[in-house]
C-alpha cells in the first residue's frame, strides 16, 4: 500500500514538475511590473498619466488579441520595443550620440508596432507620441538598466526540448538533415536542362527597369547606413529576383495575401507581389543592409501519389535575402521558406566562408556560389512545383518587365494591417507570430526540437531556422559567424 502511494506521489510530482517546466518556458514578464515603469505608474504628474495611458492601451490591445509579435516590449520600458538587431547594437553604445541613436531605434520600433495594433483595434490615441517622449526623458537616468533589459528571447522552448529528450531525439533529426543536404546538392549539381519539370516553366519578373542603386554615403552614430526612402526603393528594385517556377497548378502561382470572411489569410494569384523590407546585419565590423523579399503561394499540396504528407498544408512562402555592401552590391544571398525551414546560403566572390568545427548543430549549408552581378543582370530563382524548393540560382541579363508575368514590390509590414471583408483591418499573423490555418502535420512529430508548431508560416523576427541547434533568420551576428570579407 505504501509502495503504491509512494509511486502515485512520485508520478504526480513528475507531472507537476514537467508542467512547471513547460509553463516556465512560456512565461513572460509583465513589462509594467518592473522599474522604472512600475514607479512611473505611481506618480501623480504627467509622467504618471503617460505611464497609465500606455498601460491602459496595452491592456485593451491584449484583450482584443491584436498584439504584434515582430518585436518585443522592453521590460520596465514598455513604450519601447527591441528586435535582435537593436539588441546586438547595445554593446556599441558608449557616447551620448550613440545612446540617442539607439534609443531612437527602439522608439521607432514601438511606433511601427503600435501603428498596426491601434489600427487593427480601431483605437485612436493622440497622446501616445508625446507620452513616449515624456517617458523617455523621465527614464533617461536609467540608460544602463534599459540596455540590460533590451533583450529578445529566442524561439526555442526549453520545456519542449526537455520533454522531447532532445539530446537523444536530435540524432535522427541530424541524420535527416544530412540526407536533405545530400539530396539538395544532387539537384544543384544537375545540368539545368536535366531538372525535371512537372508543368510549364513560367517567369515572374519585377516591375520597372533595372536601375543602379546609389550607395548609402552616411551612417548614424552606431554605424547604421542612413538612406532616403527613394534610395531604399532603388536598392530593393535593383536586387529583386526573377522567379522561374515550374507551374503545375494554381498552387505554384505567386499572389498577394488577403483575408477571407473568417479572417484567415489566403492568396490572390491575380495580383503577384513580393513583400519587401530592409534589415541589417553585422559583418566584418560593419553594419550591412539586407534586402528581404517574401513570395506567397496558396498552398503546398500533398506530394503526388501521397495520401498523407506531413509537410503539406495551406499557404507556402519563399523568402529571398540579399546582403549588400556599402556600394549596394551583393555579398551573400540566402533563403528560407516562411516556416523558417530549408536555410540555404549562396555566397559571392566578395566573401570567404569561415572554417567551422564539425558539430551536429545545423550550420552553414551552401549548395552553390554565385558570381558578382554585372550591371545589366538579375538573379533568377528556379523553383520546384508543389514543394517550392529552390533548385538553382542563376544570373541572367535583365529583360525588363516584358516577359511572362510582372510582380510588384510592396512593403512587408502591410501584412500586419490587411483589409477585412467586413471592414476594418487585421494582421495576417496572430499574437504568437504564426499564420492561423497554415499548420502542418509535422508539428506533431517535430516538437522535441523545441520549435512551436514546426512548419507553420510565421512573421519576420520569429523564424527559428535550425531543428538541431539554435539559429534565427534575423540574427545580426549570423553572417559574421559564417563568413569574412575577402581582402
Identify the meaning behind each predicted range.
Residues 163-265, 304:
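Extended, regular secondary-structure scaffolds
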Residues 2-16:
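Bacterial N-terminal signal peptides that target proteins for export
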Residues 8-12, 27, 322:
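Intrinsically disordered/low-complexity terminal segments and short unstructured peptides
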Residues 250-333:
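Short N-terminal edge-element motif at the start of the domain
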Residues 23-25:
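C-terminal motif of bacterial Sec signal peptides marking the signal peptidase cleavage site
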Residues 29-211, 312-316, 326-487:
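Domain-length functional cores that host ligand/cofactor binding and catalytic or interaction surfaces
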Amino acid at each position: 500500500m505504501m509502495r503504491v502511494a509512494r509511486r502515485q506521489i512520485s508520478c504526480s510530482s513528475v507531472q507537476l514538475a514537467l508542467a512547471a517546466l513547460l509553463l516556465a518556458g512560456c512565461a513572460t514578464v509583465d513589462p509594467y511590473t518592473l522599474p522604472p515603469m512600475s514607479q512611473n505608474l505611481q506618480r501623480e504628474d504627467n509622467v504618471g498619466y503617460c505611464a497609465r495611458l500606455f498601460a491602459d492601451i496595452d491592456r485593451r490591445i491584449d484583450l482584443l488579441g491584436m498584439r504584434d509579435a515582430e518585436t518585443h516590449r522592453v521590460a520596465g520600458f514598455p513604450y519601447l520595443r527591441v528586435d535582435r538587431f537593436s539588441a546586438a547594437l547595445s554593446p556599441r553604445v558608449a557616447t551620448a550620440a550613440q545612446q540617442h541613436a539607439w534609443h531612437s531605434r527602439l522608439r521607432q520600433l514601438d511606433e511601427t508596432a503600435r501603428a498596426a495594433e491601434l489600427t487593427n483595434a480601431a483605437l485612436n490615441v493622440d497622446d501616445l507620441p508625446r507620452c513616449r517622449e515624456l517617458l523617455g526623458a523621465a527614464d533617461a537616468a536609467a540608460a544602463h538598466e534599459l540596455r540590460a533589459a533590451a533583450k529578445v528571447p529566442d524561439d526555442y522552448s526549453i520545456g519542449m526540448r526537455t520533454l522531447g529528450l532532445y539530446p537523444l531525439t536530435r540524432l535522427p533529426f541530424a541524420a535527416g538533415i544530412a540526407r536533405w543536404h545530400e539530396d539538395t546538392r544532387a539537384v544543384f549539381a544537375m545540368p539545368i536542362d536535366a531538372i525535371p519539370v512537372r508543368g510549364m516553366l513560367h517567369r515572374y519578373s519585377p516591375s520597372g527597369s533595372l536601375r543602379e542603386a546609389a550607395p548609402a554615403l552616411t551612417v548614424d552614430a552606431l554605424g547604421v547606413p542612413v538612406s532616403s526612402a527613394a534610395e531604399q526603393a532603388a536598392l530593393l528594385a535593383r536586387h529583386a529576383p526573377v522567379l522561374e517556377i515550374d507551374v503545375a497548378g494554381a498552387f505554384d502561382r505567386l499572389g498577394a495575401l488577403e483575408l477571407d470572411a473568417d479572417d484567415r489569410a489566403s492568396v490572390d494569384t491575380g495580383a503577384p507581389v513580393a513583400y519587401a523590407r530592409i534589415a541589417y546585419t553585422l559583418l566584418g565590423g560593419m553594419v550591412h543592409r539586407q534586402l528581404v523579399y517574401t513570395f506567397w503561394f496558396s498552398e503546398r499540396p500533398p506530394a503526388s501519389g501521397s495520401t498523407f504528407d506531413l509537410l503539406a498544408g495551406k499557404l507556402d512562402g519563399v523568402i529571398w535575402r540579399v546582403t549588400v555592401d556599402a556600394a549596394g552590391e551583393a555579398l551573400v544571398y540566402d533563403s528560407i521558406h516562411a516556416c523558417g525551414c530549408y536555410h540555404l546560403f549562396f555566397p559571392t566572390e566578395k566573401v570567404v566562408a569561415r572554417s567551422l568545427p564539425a558539430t551536429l548543430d545545423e550550420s552553414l549549408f551552401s549548395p552553390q556560389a554565385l558570381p558578382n552581378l554585372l550591371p545589366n543582370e538579375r538573379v533568377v530563382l528556379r523553383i520546384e512545383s508543389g514543394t517550392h524548393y529552390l533548385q538553382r540560382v542563376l544570373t541572367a541579363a535583365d529583360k525588363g518587365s516584358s516577359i511572362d508575368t510582372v510582380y510588384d514590390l510592396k512593403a512587408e509590414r502591410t501584412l500586419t494591417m490587411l483589409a477585412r471583408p467586413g471592414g476594418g483591418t487585421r494582421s495576417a499573423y496572430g499574437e504568437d507570430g504564426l499564420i492561423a490555418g497554415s499548420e502542418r502535420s509535422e508539428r506533431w512529430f517535430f516538437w522535441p526540437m523545441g520549435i512551436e508548431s514546426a512548419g507553420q508560416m510565421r512573421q519576420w523576427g520569429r523564424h527559428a531556422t535550425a531543428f538541431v541547434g539554435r539559429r534565427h533568420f534575423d540574427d545580426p551576428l549570423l553572417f559574421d559567424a559564417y563568413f569574412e570579407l575577402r581582402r
